[in-house]
């Protein structure tokens, strides 16, 4: 009943009315202004399709809401226009009193205030200094006009045939007879006379006389130079001269001038300070610049990827097996990773020590001095007792029945006898119970085991050199440890102990020492020197005396 094309279509005539009735927030200002209420009401009154009474009521609600919106917009526009007019025409402030219809000049004129800008004084600015820095001298930017010595003979005859000197009637006999007469007396008057001879052809511009004066001005200070230049100047005589003309023999040197000699063209400056020397131009650089770089066509030898290469790349899984070594996300984790290695864990401090001296002190003070001193004294005492004697222990790997008793080395016997003797003296004074005996035995056993371990480490290189075999060295080391443990157990048995606890024997020992003691007990069990028993798994192991306890 409510769904019709007239109402629901966006372009329908009643769509905006239906939207205003049911969804007023969706209605925009443009929709309100575009809606014509008169036409809309006519369509509601006489619709093309029959509309239900309830639908028409909804449409009337939409018409009322749109009309309300239009009234609000009109009221807002009128209020805004009224406010603007009220602000524009203010009678209390603008209207003048009846007594004075003319406003004062100051009230209607803005004051002309010229502020003093912070500018430099023009008189104090020195313009010559920056201009002088960027200004070049005329001699540096002007090409020099070099006047050669040929100007005297070629300037006036520019464009004429070079037949002036070839005319037979040009030179007088006196001139030809004396070749030095052309240059000996050079003055302004002589140049004027020669000018009248050589520059007889005028060009009609009226400057025929200016050429000589210009040359006189240029050459007025260089008369000596001109004399030397003209002495070296070759004067070509006409080939048609008669052979009857004679030349004075005294002036033969002046006449014999080589033809290959070139004129020394040098321009002298009036002020020597103005001259400067140009650097020579390298011809190779100019040639390299002019060379054009040849373009070569580069073509890839492989223009396409083969199917085998593509299959090989797809089947390759090596990139998935690579170990990704990514940097830590933070700087602190990076420092921890760098200093957390084994090489730096026990040699550097946890905090950053910038000073190198502090780092050296930390490494020196890492081990206690008491531990170092005790280790050194122990080594010295062992070296004195052992000396240079070689240690030779019989093998334990043979049958137990074939050995009545295995002999110990004399040096090890001395060490064990001294330690056990001191131990017996302490035990005989305070023997009351088995617990007291075990409490006093454990420190002696620990000291003995540590001493034996250090002795074995000290004598290891000597044994290696004497035996020459690694297997023999290991066997001798285990033989020493085996007999040391067996002698200690024998001493305990003589004091009245029938059973030995592995837990008490391994007290204050690290894992390596405890494993060595346990392995020694297993070897003694194999040779039937002791018997091992354990009540429950992971319980303490008890060792008792075996049949071969005193026969090994």
Curated annotation (Swiss-Prot):
Principal place of residence: nucleus
TM regions (residue ranges): none
Tissue/organ expression: Specifically expressed in male and female gonads (at protein level).
Family annotation (InterPro entries): NXP1_M-like, Rad21/Rec8-like, Rad21/Rec8_C_eu, Rad21_Rec8_N, ScpA-like_C, WH_DNA-bd_sf
Keywords: Chromosome, Chromosome partition, Meiosis, Nucleus
GO-annotated biological processes: double-strand break repair; double-strand break repair via homologous recombination; fertilization; homologous chromosome pairing at meiosis; meiotic attachment of telomere to nuclear envelope; seminiferous tubule development; sister chromatid cohesion; spermatogenesis
Summary of the knockout phenotype: Male mice are sterile due to defects in chromosome synapsis at prophase I, leading to an arrest at a zygotene-like stage leading to total azoospermia. Females are fertile but develop an age-dependent sterility.
Keyword Transmembrane helix: no
Listed Pfam families: Rad21_Rec8, Rad21_Rec8_N
Region (Disordered): 389-409
Subcellular location: Nucleus; Chromosome
GO CC annotation, single: chromosome
Stated role: Meiosis-specific component of some cohesin complex required during the initial steps of prophase I in male meiosis. Probably required during early meiosis in males for separation of sister chromatids and homologous chromosomes. Replaces RAD21 in premeiotic S phase (during early stages of prophase I), while RAD21 reappears in later stages of prophase I. Involved in synaptonemal complex assembly, synapsis initiation and crossover recombination between homologous chromosomes during prophase I. Not required for meiosis in females in young mice, while it is required later as mice age.
Complex and partners: Component of some meiotic cohesin complex composed of the SMC1 (SMC1A or SMC1B) and SMC3 heterodimer attached via their hinge domain, RAD21L which link them, and STAG3.
Similarity field: Belongs to the rad21 family.
Record-given protein name: Double-strand-break repair protein rad21-like protein 1
């Amino acid at each position: 009943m409510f769904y019709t094309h007239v109402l629901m279509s966006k372009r329908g005539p009643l769509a905006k009315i239906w939207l205003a009735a049911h969804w007023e927030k969706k209605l925009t200002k443009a929709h309100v202004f575009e809606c014509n209420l008169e036409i809309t009401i006519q369509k509601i009154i006489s619709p093309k399709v029959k509309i239900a009474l309830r639908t028409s009521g909804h449409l009337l609600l939409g018409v009322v809401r749109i009309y309300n919106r239009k009234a609000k917009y009109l009221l807002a526009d009128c209020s805004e226009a009224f406010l603007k007019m009220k602000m524009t025409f203010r009678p209390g402030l603008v209207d003048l009193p009846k007594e004075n219809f003319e406003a004062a000049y100051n009230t209607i004129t803005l004051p002309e205030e010229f502020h003093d800008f912070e500018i430099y004084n023009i008189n104090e600015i020195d313009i010559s200094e920056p201009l002088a820095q960027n200004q070049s001298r005329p001699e540096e930017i002007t090409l020099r006009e070099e006047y050669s010595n040929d100007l005297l003979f070629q300037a006036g005859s520019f464009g004429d045939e070079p037949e002036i000197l070839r005319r037979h009637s040009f030179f007088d006999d006196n001139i030809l007879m004396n070749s030095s007469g052309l240059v000996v007396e050079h003055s302004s008057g002589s140049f004027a006379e020669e000018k009248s001879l050589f520059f007889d052809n005028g060009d009609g511009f009226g400057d025929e006389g200016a050429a000589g004066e210009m040359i006189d001005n240029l050459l007025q200070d260089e008369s000596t130079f001109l004399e030397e230049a003209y002495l070296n100047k070759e004067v070509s005589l006409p080939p048609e001269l008669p052979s009857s003309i004679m030349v004075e023999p005294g002036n033969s040197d002046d006449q014999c001038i080589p033809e290959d000699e070139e004129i020394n063209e040098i321009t002298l400056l009036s002020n020597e300070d103005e001259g400067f020397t140009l650097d020579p131009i390298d011809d190779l650089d100019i040639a390299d610049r002019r060379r054009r770089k040849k373009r070569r066509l580069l073509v890839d030898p492989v223009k396409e990827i083969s199917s085998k290469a593509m299959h090989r790349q797809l089947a390759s899984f090596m990139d998935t097996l690579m170990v990704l070594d990514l940097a830590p996300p933070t700087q602190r984790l990076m420092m921890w990773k760098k200093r957390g290695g084994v090489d730096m864990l026990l040699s550097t401090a946890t905090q950053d020590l910038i000073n190198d001296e502090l780092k050296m002190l930390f490494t020196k003070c890492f081990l206690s001095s008491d531990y170092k001193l005790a280790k050194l004294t122990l080594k010295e005492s062992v070296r004195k007792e052992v000396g240079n004697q070689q240690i030779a222990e019989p093998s334990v790997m043979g049958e137990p029945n074939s050995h009545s008793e295995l002999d110990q080395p004399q040096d090890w016997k001395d060490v064990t006898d001294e330690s056990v003797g001191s131990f017996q003296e302490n035990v005989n004074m305070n023997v009351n119970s088995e617990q007291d005996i075990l409490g006093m035995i454990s420190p002696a056993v620990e000291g003995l085991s540590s001493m034996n371990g250090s002795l074995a480490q000290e004598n290891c290189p000597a044994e290696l050199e004497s035996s020459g075999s690694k297997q023999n060295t290991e066997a001798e080391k285990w033989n020493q440890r085996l007999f040391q443990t067996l002698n200690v157990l024998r001493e305990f048995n003589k004091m009245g102990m029938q059973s030995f606890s592995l837990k008490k024997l391994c007290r204050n020992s690290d894992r390596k020492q405890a494993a060595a003691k346990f392995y020694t007990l297993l070897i003694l069990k194999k040779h039937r020197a002791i018997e091992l028993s354990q009540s429950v798994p992971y319980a303490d192991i008890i060792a008792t005396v075996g049949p071969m306890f005193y026969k090994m």
